[in-house]
Regions:
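Chalcogenol-based redox active-site neighborhoods
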Residues: 20-178
């Protein structure tokens, strides 16, 4: 693990936090930022690949962690409903393709996981990478947010400060899906 002197870490956190001041704040009705990322098999996947379909993009911190596993499994439990309603589910984290493959295999996840490596440029475009606090420490990390993109490529709904274990249920209730 790479270690930096504390003054370097503080500088990086302050510098990256200032960069957030210049990030675009997305809102409902905005065009969803286009992206191309690699999936668990190193295939390039673009948002535009799903033009004409609704897409759920959920950003999560890390594969195989308690909250992220609950969130992924909640999407898996509701997979049939999303399929029946022609909705694509994309999970995005900074984990690499090999980590995603293991996570998918371990929990038999039926949807696509994409890797957004540091500096997490796609997550930053979606206001989903920034300063976090945990146990009194500040660090830069993936922020758990979910976006519903309509069939025209516009942001239909934004879910921030989500409860990981019931995120998919929440979307299904909002859209009145069955």
């Amino acid at each position: 693990m790479l270690r930096f002197p504390s003054y370097t870490t503080k500088f990086l956190v302050v510098y990256l936090d200032r960069l957030q001041l210049f990030s675009m704040v997305l809102k409902i009705g905005d065009k969803a930022p286009e992206f191309t990322l690699k999936d668990s098999f190193d295939n390039e996947i673009s948002l535009s690949d799903f033009k004409g379909k609704k897409v759920i993009i959920y950003f999560y911190p890390k594969d195989n962690t308690p909250g992220c596993t609950k969130e992924a499994c909640n999407f898996k439990e509701n997979w049939d409903i999303f399929q029946k309603n022609n909705i694509i589910v994309l999970g995005i984290s900074k984990d690499n393709s090999a980590s995603h493959q293991k996570f998918i295999e371990k929990f038999d996840l039926p949807f696509i996981l994409l890797t957004d490596p540091l500096p997490c440029q796609v997550a930053a475009k979606y206001d989903s990478y920034g300063l976090k606090k945990f146990m009194g420490k500040e660090y830069m990390g993936m922020i758990r947010n979910t976006f519903l993109i309509d069939s025209e490529g516009n942001i239909e709904k934004i879910y921030s400060k989500v409860k990981a274990a019931i995120m998919a249920d929440h979307i299904i209730n909002d859209l009145r899906l069955s």
